[in-house]
């Protein structure tokens, strides 16, 4: 967890097994009313399998990509995610920092009693870059 209000959790789940463990933990250990996922996956990973495991617990997903040359393009990931989540629950933001800002904006609802969690997942590089960006963002 790198931030509270909104709660932001980083988890480098980069395969379906890891995504299932993340989904189980979120379902059993947290009490979120809504979950926003920021997901960036490497091109050689099972993106469909990862997203299938996350779908039951994620309300909407922001697909993105890290700076790695191995990263799947956000547009390709959007196509996969839209088949699993439906187009109305998927947003594509190719730049990771902008995707994170979008998630924080989506999760910030001053007049709401809802507890909204943000998870960042899909690859070690995505999570590492997100961690660096979020530390700078919230250090201000």
Regions found by a protein language model. Name each.
Residues 30-34, 83-87, 138-139:
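Short helix-capping segments at alpha-helix termini
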Residues 117-121:
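Periplasmic-binding protein-like
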Residues 19-20, 47-49, 73-74, 129-132:
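Short glycine-/acidic-enriched loop or helix-start segments at secondary-structure transitions
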